[in-house]
Structures are given as C-alpha cells and as structure tokens.
Amino acid sequence: MSTSSQTIDVDALLDFSACDGSYNSPSLSPSTASKPTFASPVTAAVSTPSLPSTTQTLSGPSHNYDMYRQQTGFVPGALTNTMAVNQTNNTGYQDFGSLDYLSSFSPENDVFDFNASPSQGTMEMEFESPADSQFFPTVNPSSIQHDTSALSQTSSVGRLWPGAHSQAALAKAQAQQRQQQQQQQLIQQTQRQTSPKSRGKAPQPTDPIVEQKITQLLNSMRAKPASNEPESQSVLNNLPKSKKDEEEMDEDERLLASEEGKKLSSKERRQLRNKVSARAFRSRRKEYISQLEAEIANKVNENGDLRSQNRALMDENKRLSDLTRMLLSSPSFSTFLDNLSANPTGLPQGSPVKIEQNPQQEQNQVPKDVNAYNSQFSSQQQIGMAMIPEQTMDFSLLSLGNTYNFQPQVFVVDTPEVPNAIDASVLSGKTSNFVEESFSSDDEKVEVPVIERPLKTKAIETPEAPVDEEFESDPEFALFHSEPATTTTTPKDIDTENLTGIDLFGGIESEKMFARYELVNATEEEATAAFAMARVQRISASIDSVVSRLELLTMDI
C-alpha cells in the first residue's frame, strides 16, 4: 500500500482555483503546481479512466436560462446515479461488514501446532485490506478530465463541485480497483490452500516422483493466473461548459445580447428567446444522447469484463478440481481414502493422519450423568499426536458452582383475625345494630330488586286457507265456490258494580296503585298547607338522623 510521506494540506482537498480573481480572468492559481498530489492507496496498478488532453471546450448559450427555473423535480437519472455513488462510497457508514482481513486464515491452517518445532511455525497473514473510499481525498473533476498543464489560459470558470457523471466515473474506477484486489487475494488464497504444508506432521512414506509432479503443477498454476482483460476507458463528455464568446454566437444570440435587442418589443424578444432556447435544447439533447450512448458502451464493456472474469474463475475451479482428483488418486493419500470410505462423516480439517486408539478406551462406558465440562474438554484433541488413554472424570460429582443454589421455601401456618376496630356504619351515618336487635329486613337490602311487569300473551295466528286461482276462475266449478266466512263479535257482559276479573292497572295490584296515587280535591290554601306540612316532616326526619348520629358519637363520653 503506497503512502505519501508529505504533509497533507487541507487546501489540496478542494480546488478553489475557479474562485480566484474575477470571472473575466480565470487564470489558474499559481499554488496548484506546488501542492502535493496524493496517489490512490491501491496495491495493483489500475488504469483510471481519463480523457485525452484537448483544448476544445464546449460553450453554453449566452442567455441565462437558469434565471426562471421551472419546478420539474429531479433531473432524469440523477437519483439513481446519486444512490449508486453513495452505495459505492459507503457515504456516512463505516465498512465493518467486510471480512477481507480474515481471508488469510484458511480452515486447513492451524494457528497453533504443538507437533512442529517453533522455528517452523510461521504465521501467514496479509494486512493489505483495501482502504475505505471515505479516506480518499476529494478528486477535482478537472484533474480527471485533462491535465492542468494542457488547460488554456483563456478558458472560463469551471465547476467547483464534481458532477454526477464524474462521481460515477470515479466510483466505477474504485470499484474496478477493489474487484482486482479481491481477485488477486482469492488467487493467492487458493494457491495457499493447494500448496503443501511446510509444517511437519506425522511421518508418512512419500513418493519423490509424486511430490515432484505436485510441485510442478503448483508452479504452473502460479505462473498461469487468471488473465484479466484490460479495462476499457470510459470517455465522458461532461466537460465544464463556459459562457459563449461573442465570436461563437450566432446572429440571433448576438442580437439578443446587444443593445439593439433590448430595444425590440417584448413579443419580438420572446420569439427570439424561444428560437435561441430551441436551438440550445436541440444541442443539449444531442449531447445527452451521446452521453447515454457512451454509458451504454461502458456497461457493455463492463459486462464483457465480468463474463471474462467468470470464465476465468470457472477455468480455475476446473483446474483445482482436476488437481484435487489427481492428488487423491496418488498413493500418498491411500490412507486418507481408506479412512474416508470407512467413515465418510468424520472428515478431518487438517492432513489425514491415522490416530492410534487404545482398545481399552473403547471398553470404558460413559456415565449417564455427564457434565457439560466433560464433553467440552474431551472433544479438544490435537490431530497428529498420539492419544494417551485417560480415565474420564465426572465433573458433576464435584458440585461446582452450587454455592448460591439455595431455594427458600415459605409456609403459612395460621393467619390471625384482624379485629374490627372501626365501625363503618358509624362513619357512613347509618344506624348500626350493635344496640338494637337485628331484623331480617337487613338481608333484603343486599338483594337486587326485581321489576314486575305484565306478561305479554302472544296472539294465536290462524293459518289462512290456500286459494287456487284457476279453480276459483273456472265457471264449471261455480257451485263449489266457498264463500268467505263472516265473523261476528258478541259483546261480553261486564260487571260494572264489582269490576271483578278486569285488569284495570295493567297487572299491577290495586293496593299498590291506591297507595301511590291519591286523589285530593282541595283548594289552593289547603294545598299550600299540605306542602308546608310535608316540608316540615322532611326536615324533622333529617334532623332526627343527625341527632341519632350525634348520640352514637357521644355515647362513650
């Protein structure tokens, strides 16, 4: 990874050369030549897309069309380009999800090998993970398009901030660099996996001819990595547009910008502006079409590159499968094939080594109550080391970790009755029955009153006889026609003297009705006297209740 030994200048991150001086003298800042340039921190040399140096600059219309901007929303394609750039650059988020730094650890490589000498134990780790794109310096779009030495001193003001197309080009270049780095790391990882291990294992009879063949194959695979086709450079036509000079204007634009054009009527100026804007729109549309065609060409090239990479990976996979098949067919792996055929599920992680087992250990029966510690420690066995028969230990007999295993138990034997120290009847204002004798009417207060209502008898409906229209309209059966039955109601005899058997009050007893309703025929004076007497009785009744409460409260005094 290449690093710059120079001190980083904050002014080098932003290009303020376009803002120096007035707009009429857009000369380059003399300090740009002395500012340090930072190289992209990439290991592999990648050809970044750049434009050929040219002095041709596109000129825009003389009229300021951005003065009255229409509310048209987003530019077509702006949102997709922005999301693509943010997704590529990981804007605002740290790239903690990539596990590229773990690619050097393969499952076949043991971190600690106690069977080998300390001098042979080498750790193969590569700390060359690609740097995040958020640490890259801000790239000036003018430096991507052409060199600063080839810029014309008469060019107009360029862009201060990079456009969407320049950001997309930069993101594409960075993605290609990361893809090439990942591919190289994948090739190196596969080479490390297929290379014979230098650490010493259990001694096995090796054939020098087979070892020589394996070495030759590995060397040939290292000499023939997956070839990558050169990336095609994408040419973008997103040059900074400058204001048109008077020499490049046509007659209509000169007339519109001159003093004579200001003297024209509003209608003529509107027609002239429409004509100029239509011409500018056609030129911009042509430019957009050319840009889209260039992007389509870039996508086609990228698709071809991906296909070539996929083909290279398929070829590499085929070569690795052939190598594995050839290695397994060699006599050096005969013991491994025998063990694999005998026990296909027990595939070891390292190189196959036959482990000597003591027949006495197989006769040892595992106790039923086995603690989890026993299974955890017994499974950690080093491959390639002779197993020493040991007596398994039941850790459940030690009662470890049972210090705080108590379970408190609480039982209720008896609950004393709480004395009724407060009389609720005294506080409520109602007379209690601790002096007087209790009556049976106190229990009736708890019961819910039942509302009496008269029972409704359902009227019995008599079914009507079916009527046959054909039979009734046929004159041949006129003699058999039935006449409608006439019902006559006979008045019932009512005993007006006693009125027995007649419900006058709708199911309510007459005693209750007479007790509630009383017919009084009196004058106004008698009525007022009766009302006053009733009020006096009501007040005296309330006074009696208050007096009784006071007597109850002052009884013990």
UniProtKB/Swiss-Prot annotation:
GO MF terms listed in the record are: DNA-binding transcription factor activity
Localization, per the record, is: Nucleus
CDD domains hit by this protein: bZIP_u1
- Could you tell me the keywords of this UniProt record? Activator, Nucleus, Repressor, Transcription, Transcription regulation, Virulence
Return the annotated region ranges for Leucine-zipper: 289-296
InterPro entries on file: bZIP, bZIP_sf
Q: Which domain of life is it from?
A: Eukaryota
Ranges for the region named Basic motif are 267-286
- Residues annotated as region Disordered? 171-209, 221-273, 344-364
Positions with biased composition (Low complexity): 171-194
Q: Where is the signal peptide?
A: none
Q: Which Pfam families does the record associate with it?
A: bZIP_1
Effect of gene disruption?
Answer: Alters culture pigmentation and leads to defects in cell wall integrity, adhesion to hydrophobic surfaces, and topical infection of insects.
The regions listed as transmembrane in this protein's record are: none
User: bZIP domain: from which residue to which, for each copy?
Assistant: 264-327
Q: What Gene Ontology terms describe where this protein resides (cellular component)?
A: nucleus
Induction, as annotated: Highly expressed during infection structure appressorium formation.
List, as start-end ranges, the regions of compositional bias called Polar residues. 229-240
Compositional bias (Basic and acidic residues) at which positions? 254-271
Q: Which PANTHER family match?
A: BZIP DOMAIN-CONTAINING PROTEIN, BZIP TRANSCRIPTION FACTOR 60-LIKE
Described function: BZIP-type transcription factor that functions as either an activator or a suppressor, and which contributes to the regulation of fungal growth, conidiation, cell wall integrity, and virulence. Plays a key role in virulence against insects by mediating cell wall integrity, cell surface hydrophobicity, and adherence to hydrophobic surfaces. Exhibits negative regulation of subtilisin proteases, but positive control of an adhesin gene.
Q: What is this protein called?
A: BZIP-type transcription factor MBZ1
* Originating organism: Metarhizium robertsii (strain ARSEF 23 / ATCC MYA-3075) (Metarhizium anisopliae (strain ARSEF 23))
Its lineage reads:
Eukaryota, Fungi, Dikarya, Ascomycota, Pezizomycotina
- Gene name linked to the record: MBZ1
